Structures are given as structure tokens and as C-alpha cells.
Amino acid sequence: MKVYVLRIGHRPDRDKRITTHVGLVARAFGAHGFVLSPCDEKVLEKLRDVEERWGRLLEEIACTNSPLKYVKTWDGTVVHLTMYGLPVDSVIDEIRQKDKILVIVGAEKVPREYYELAHYNVAIGNQPHSEVAALAIFLDRLYGGAELYRQPVGGKLRIIPTEKGKKVVKVGEEGPSGGAPGVRAERGRGGRGEGVQGADEVRGHKRGATDRDLGDET
């Protein structure tokens, strides 16, 4: 199963923080790719920096200024997260059987076309709340919690779980209980960029080699 998250309706002047959170959740909760519309290089650079420091979990970080075309040319199942949709528990088992899934996460009011193009309009409850929470819950239900235990590829930092306090080590400095650094996750997934449609409309981004001190990710 391959999962991409498409964030549409992003407003660069007001949505940078929450859209970054959508991207971080996509990365940490099992998505293979994150696509932003419209393009906002500052958000994408933040995600690349996290991947550089904490290891690669995303196969693709990209943006498109033609989101409707991106959805129309997606060669797989389209899921739109909306409070007006069907309860997640009523459709998640069926969605889990699909090979390629595009999850649409809206910002401002989502145009009607996306509701019509989606194979599944899925609600994480029918009350107003955060799209970040909706994406996290959807992906966790989709993977049944297994997404939390993937190991990233490469990276510079690892957290060693502790009962109290904080323990962060550089890759290569883990002790016997810290796990092998740079272990490639056994995800059973395709190569980089698989599942991306409308390549002429999507601009991919290589990750820059930045090196910051440990701090908040947003």
C-alpha cells in the first residue's frame, strides 16, 4: 500500500505552521509522499530539514499549482477528509485493501469538485476540529498503529526512549539498546516517486543539507 497526502488550499500568509504540522504528521504516521498546493518553499524546506536531521521517511516532498489536475490524474484511490463524510470506522477496512491512496486535506473551503472526485469522503467525527488531528487519526486507523514503529533511513539524530527525561544521540553513537543506526524500514513499498501523477504539473524538491541544533520542529 502506498499513501500520499495532498494538502490543498494552503494560504502562505496564514497557514505555514498548520500546513507544516500536516506535513510532519504525514511523515511520522506512514505516508510515502507529501504534496502541497499552492507551492510554498518555506514549508517544504522545513520538511526537508526534518528529513535531513531525523532520517528519511518520505519518498517525495513536492508541490503543485494544479491540484485538481493532480487528483484527476491520480492512478489510485482518492480519499477526502471532511467532517461531512462517512464515519471512518465504516469504510477504513475497505480503504485498507487499496494499493495506492491519495489523502486530500483541505485548508480553506474545499471546492465541490473534490467531494465528487473522491472515492471516499471520510469523516473523523462530525464536529469541527483540526485537519492535523483528522489526518493523524485516519493514518493510524489505516495502519493499525504499525506506522509508529518504522525506522527512518539515514539522518543525524535518534531519540532513545526513556521513562523520564530526554535522551537524544547522534547516529552512530547508540548503545546496544539504542538500535542500529540508519536501518532501512521494511515497508514493502515501491521506489522513490512511485504513484506520482501529472509530473509536468508537479515540482519535486531535493532536500538541502542543513544542520541545525536540536529544537522544536515548528
From Swiss-Prot:
It comes from the Archaea. S-adenosyl-L-methionine binds at residues 81, 106-110, 124-131. It is an enzyme of class 2 (transferase). GO terms for molecular function: tRNA (cytidine(56)-2'-O)-methyltransferase activity. GO terms for biological process: tRNA nucleoside ribose methylation. Residues 200-218 have a biased composition (Basic and acidic residues). It catalyses: cytidine(56) in tRNA + S-adenosyl-L-methionine = 2'-O-methylcytidine(56) in tRNA + S-adenosyl-L-homocysteine + H(+). Its main location: cytoplasm. Residues 170-218 are annotated as: Disordered. Keywords: Cytoplasm, Methyltransferase, S-adenosyl-L-methionine, Transferase, tRNA processing. SUPFAM superfamilies: alpha/beta knot. InterPro entries: Alpha/beta_knot_MTases, tRNA_m1G_MTases_N, tRNA_mtfrase_aTrm56. It is found in: Cytoplasm. GO terms for cellular component: cytoplasm. The keyword Iron-sulfur does not apply. PANTHER family: TRNA (CYTIDINE(56)-2'-O)-METHYLTRANSFERASE. Belongs to the aTrm56 family. Specifically catalyzes the AdoMet-dependent 2'-O-ribose methylation of cytidine at position 56 in tRNAs. Homodimer. This is tRNA (cytidine(56)-2'-O)-methyltransferase. It comes from Ignicoccus hospitalis (strain KIN4/I / DSM 18386 / JCM 14125).
